[in-house]
């Protein structure tokens, strides 16, 4: 689990799935006391390993932790609920998707957040243009960034180009499920290699 915040998802997976092993990583370096208390009560076999202060895009630390916890075993699932930013999320995908077993699932949460924020801002602008303009001026320059949803669009194209790598992409508002195919994928394979030349030209990567 990448990005555990207050640990609600970790607790849910622990109770529902009773995993043989579960690794959670979180950017914040401050442990969540309520999660620690929950694990002390419900994880007597110490199957859950939470590591704090880990950046999801750390291409050295993240693979090291996965290897430490799971060894050479394939993963059943990965849940990315961390930064919700394009760059770090691509880095995580490139590291962890190849580690999934055949038919394993990669879950990306809150991919549509940028668009929901945009809609809300446009509704506010329409209802009171002068007030909206003042608040934008106070806020300063808007930082342009690649929307998180770009990753979802690229994965859909990747499934068309390489169905033996990604046989299924299921998208709903706020959540995306990506299934692992039968073909081997080298660890750290860049996302552009999933796309093929046509896909690369579509996204200018």
Where are each of the predicted segments found?
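S-adenosylmethionine/decaboxylated-SAM
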Residues: 1-205
């Amino acid at each position: 689990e990448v990005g555990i915040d207050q640990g609600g998802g970790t607790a849910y997976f622990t109770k529902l799935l009773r995993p043989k092993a579960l690794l959670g990583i979180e950017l914040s370096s401050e442990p969540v006391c309520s999660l620690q208390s929950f694990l002390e009560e419900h994880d007597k076999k110490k199957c859950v390993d939470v590591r704090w202060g880990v950046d999801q895009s750390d291409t050295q630390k993240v693979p090291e932790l996965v290897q430490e916890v799971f060894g050479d075993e394939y993963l059943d699932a990965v849940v990315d609920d961390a930064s919700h930013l394009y760059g770090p999320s691509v880095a995580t995908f490139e590291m962890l998707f190849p580690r999934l077993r055949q038919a394993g699932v990669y879950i990306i949460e809150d991919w549509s957040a940028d668009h929901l924020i945009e809609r809300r801002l446009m509704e506010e602008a329409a209802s009171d243009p002068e007030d909206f303009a003042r608040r934008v001026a106070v806020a300063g320059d808007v930082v342009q960034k690649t929307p998180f949803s770009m990753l979802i669009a690229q994965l859909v194209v990747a499934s068309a180009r390489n169905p033996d790598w990604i046989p299924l992409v299921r998208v709903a508002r706020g959540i995306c499920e990506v299934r692992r195919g039968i073909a081997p994928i080298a660890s750290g394979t860049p996302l552009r290699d999933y796309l093929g030349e046509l896909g690369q030209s579509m996204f200018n990567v």
